[in-house]
Each structure stands twice: as structure tokens, then as C-alpha cells.
Amino acid sequence: MTEQNHILDAVYGVILARKATQTENSYTASLMRKGLDSVLKKVGEEATELVIAGKGGVADEVVYEAADLFFHTLLLLSYQDIPLERVYTELRRRFGISGIDEKNSRTT
């Protein structure tokens, strides 16, 4: 893996640092101070913006909105004290399994 492949880890590390220091001029810290509902609202907004960009079909807009959604998803993980490695573990677990088989294996 190249250093570029670790960008999610790097961004997550910055988010964790901003959470810990609660710097006044930090967007991340500011959003976290507003609470879970504000964090969830932002994730929802970014997901919607990605869907709209996808419908528009302009690759640069899709990439931009996907990056926003990734960032805010990482922020939510941090807010809830969920290590990024847990997402990696889940993705590795699913890798190579058909989506239908994976869904059927879940407990309800």
C-alpha cells in the first residue's frame, strides 16, 4: 500500500485530535460540541448531496460529495468512539461474499 492509501487513517487521526482538543476555530470540534443530532444531520445532508451529484452525473461533483460524506462518516465514528479499524474489519469480513449471501447471514 502507498501512503495515499492511508488517507482515511490520517483524516480520522486529525478528527480524533480535534475532538480531544476542542479548539474554538475547529469545524470538527464545533460540530461535535453541538451533539449527536447535529452530527447525524450533517451525515444525512452529505449523503443526500452525494445522491444528487450522482444523479447529475458530473464526476468531479460526485467525487467532491463522496469526500464530504467520507469525512462526516469518520466524524460520526469518532463522536461515537468507534475505531476506524472496526469498519476495515467489517469490510474485510464482507470481501469476497456475495451481497445477497452477506445480507442473508445477518441476524435480525
Swiss-Prot record:
Protein name per the record: Phosphoribosyl-ATP pyrophosphatase
Keywords: Amino-acid biosynthesis, ATP-binding, Cytoplasm, Histidine biosynthesis, Hydrolase, Nucleotide-binding
Coiled coil: none
Pathway: Amino-acid biosynthesis; L-histidine biosynthesis; L-histidine from 5-phospho-alpha-D-ribose 1-diphosphate: step 2/9
Family of this protein: Belongs to the PRA-PH family.
A GO MF term: ATP binding
Principal subcellular localisation of the protein: cytoplasm
Superkingdom of origin: Bacteria
Reactions performed catalytically: 1-(5-phospho-beta-D-ribosyl)-ATP + H2O = 1-(5-phospho-beta-D-ribosyl)-5'-AMP + diphosphate + H(+)
GO cellular component: cytoplasm
Record carries keyword tRNA-binding: no
PANTHER family to which the protein is assigned, alphabetical: HISTIDINE BIOSYNTHESIS BIFUNCTIONAL PROTEIN, HISTIDINE BIOSYNTHESIS BIFUNCTIONAL PROTEIN HISIE
Cell compartment(s), UniProt: Cytoplasm
SUPFAM superfamilies the record matches: all-alpha NTP pyrophosphatases
Entry EC no(s): 3.6.1.31
Enzyme class: hydrolase
InterPro entries reported for this sequence: HisE (IPR008179), PRib-ATP_PPHydrolase-like (IPR021130)
Any Pfam family hit: PRA-PH
